[in-house]
Amino acid sequence: KPKISMNILLLGSGGRECALAWKMSQSKKLSKLFIGPGNGGTAAYGTNVALKPTDFAAVSEFVVANAIDMVVVGNEDPLVAGIYDYFKSVDALKDVLVVGPSKAGAMLEGSKDFAKEFMLRHGIPTARHLSVNSENIAAGEAFLESLKAPYVLKADGLAAGKGVLILDSLDEAKSELRLMLDG
C-alpha cells in the first residue's frame, strides 16, 4: 500500500534543485522535504542540510536517521558515481526509492564518448563525431577540416552543462581543441 505522506531528500544545490523543491513542496503527499546541500532558494521550500551528494556514507546515515522514503538526485555527479547502485546494495536502504538511473545508465550523461558510441550502436541519429585525445590531436584537426562551420567541441565527462564550445572559425576550433587537450 502506498504511503500517504513521504519524507523526501533532494540532492543538489543548483537552480534545478530549487525548481524541483518548489514543485515538490506543493504536493499533499509530502511530509518533510530536505535538500542536501541546497541553496538560498531551496530553503524557502524545505530544510537545507549539510550533505555532500557524493558522500554516500553521510547521505545514507541521514536517510536512515530521518526515515527518508525517497531520494531525488538532482545533479549528475552522484548518479555517475553510482548512488542508485549503492542504495540498492545496502540492506537498510533497499526500500528507499531513488529517482535517477543506475551508474551504467548515468554513463549516457557522464561520458559524451559513451553516449555517441551508444547512439551509433543502436541506430539513433546523431551528428558526426570523432573522439580525440592528446595522442591523436592531428586526426582531430583533420576531422575539423572535413566539416563545415559551426564547429562543436565537447569535453568528455561531466561539465555542469558548460562543456560545449560552438565556434564559427576553423582556426579557432583547432586552437580550442589543443587547449582542451593540452591545458
Residue ranges and their predicted role:
Residues G110-F143:
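Short, glycine-/small-residue-rich phosphate/pyrophosphate-handling segment
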Residues A43-Y45, M107-D113:
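Short, charged, surface-exposed secondary-structure boundary motifs
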Residues K52-D55, S111, E135-N136, S169:
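Acidic/polar helix N-cap motif
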Residues F62, A142-F143, E176:
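CheY-like receiver
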